[in-house]
Amino acid sequence: FLPDFFYGLEEVELAYRIIDGGWAIRYEPDIVSEELEHPAGRRPKRDVQTDRLANKYIISYLRMPQPWLLINMIAFTPYLLYFAGGEASVGRAVRQFATWLRKADRPRRRPIGKAATRYIRACGGSTWR
């Protein structure tokens, strides 16, 4: 995973890089993994969802081709707010994204190619979310 993502959607960014590199993602129902929660618990839901939204902005900027980048930036915010029950700070997520954009050592923007976009659609996915 990229070190830019402490928590939230880091697997999506990794999947974009894998697919864009020409690899396929295979579902194998016999392989099971368990995500363990830290004994101290998670941070408050609002903080977690805000970080997730900021990470989505970063991932979209890094990997989404146009026009999907713009569509994603506009459409994903209400999508996340709906599913998170309004438990996210859009303003704070935008500030986190803006801070990340100003970092001198941040990764360069490398949108996924057309073959990766076709693969995502062929698997039943959508590029905008």
Predicted regions and their residues:
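A short, conserved alpha-helix in the catalytic core of glycosyltransferases
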Residues: F1-V32
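A structural signal for well-ordered alpha-helical segments within the folded catalytic domains
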Residues: V12-E13, T50-A54, I58, A88
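Conserved beta-strand termini and adjacent loop/short-helix elements that scaffold enzyme active sites
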Residues: E28-D30, L36, R109, G113
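Non-catalytic, C-terminal membrane-associated alpha-helical segments of glycosyltransferases
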Residues: T50-D51, Q66-R129
